[in-house]
């Protein structure tokens, strides 16, 4: 669909295959062969948190103010987890957090056609040790979740009116909760998508996570068994349990 015209998505959602999900059926991440990218340091609070975790390195301060945004690959095609699928924390990390984000879905020409909810699960201890470890802190098995569905831009609220809410639960109780406004983002959504499409071909389109302003305190780290719930105005709620990702396996296993 994302390799075609913008109207294709609306036609598909209005077609005979559309309808409620059968009870008990698993819900996958609402993407197919699209890669998931992410933008970093798009909110002031995110910049401050990255500076704190990185012992005062000023690279994050510079990218917050720069014309060119930070963009990185978050999940290979087919790797994002859907609703109620487990997200992972690395066994070789001791500080892991969810990053609740508005995800924009763009077609092959870079036109934003839909929104969904994204969770950019991250190892702050690995990234904080050295910024060059960013791919290991961000891109690993079960580090990305998307869902619960795609909402076409024609049916979604204006992003300026969207609010992101995060709740982390442990042992059935609320451990942490916070919320932020998408309107507080320093960069615009079309600006971020434009930078992503520069110099590369994305024939099936792409999903772009657009950053977060919700940063759990340093003493909080995700543990296996926790549950992460993210809600965005007009897009529903994405909920995922947390599991441990084994990092001791041999290559090729």
Stretch-by-stretch model annotation:
Residues 124-253:
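Catalytic-pocket segment enriched in acidic/His residues
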């Amino acid at each position: 669909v994302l390799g075609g015209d913008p109207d294709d998505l609306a036609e598909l959602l209005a077609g005979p295959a559309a309808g409620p999900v059968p009870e008990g059926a698993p819900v996958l991440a609402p993407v197919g062969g699209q890669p998931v990218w992410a933008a970093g340091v798009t909110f002031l609070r995110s910049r401050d948190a990255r500076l704190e975790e990185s012992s005062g390195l000023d690279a994050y301060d510079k990218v917050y103010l720069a014309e060119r945004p930070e963009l990185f690959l978050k999940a290979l095609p087919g790797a994002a987890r859907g609703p109620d699928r487990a997200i992972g924390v690395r066994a070789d990390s001791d500080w892991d957090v969810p990053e609740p984000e508005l995800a924009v879905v763009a077609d092959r020409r870079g036109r934003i056609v839909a929104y969904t909810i994204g969770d950019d699960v991250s190892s702050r201890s690995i990234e904080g040790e050295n910024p060059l470890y960013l791919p290991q802190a961000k891109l690993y098995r079960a580090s990305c979740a998307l869902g619960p569905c795609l909402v076409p831009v024609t049916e979604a609220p204006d992003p300026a009116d969207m609010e992101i809410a995060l709740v982390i639960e442990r042992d059935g109780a609320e451990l942490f909760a916070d919320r932020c406004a998408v309107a507080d983002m320093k960069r615009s959504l079309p600006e971020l998508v434009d930078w992503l499409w520069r110099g590369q071909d994305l024939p099936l389109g792409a999903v772009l996570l657009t950053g977060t302003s919700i940063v759990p305190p340093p003493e909080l780290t995700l543990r296996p068994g926790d549950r992460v719930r993210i809600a965005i105005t007009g897009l529903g709620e994405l909920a995922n349990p947390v599991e441990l990702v084994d990092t001791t396996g041999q290559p090729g296993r």
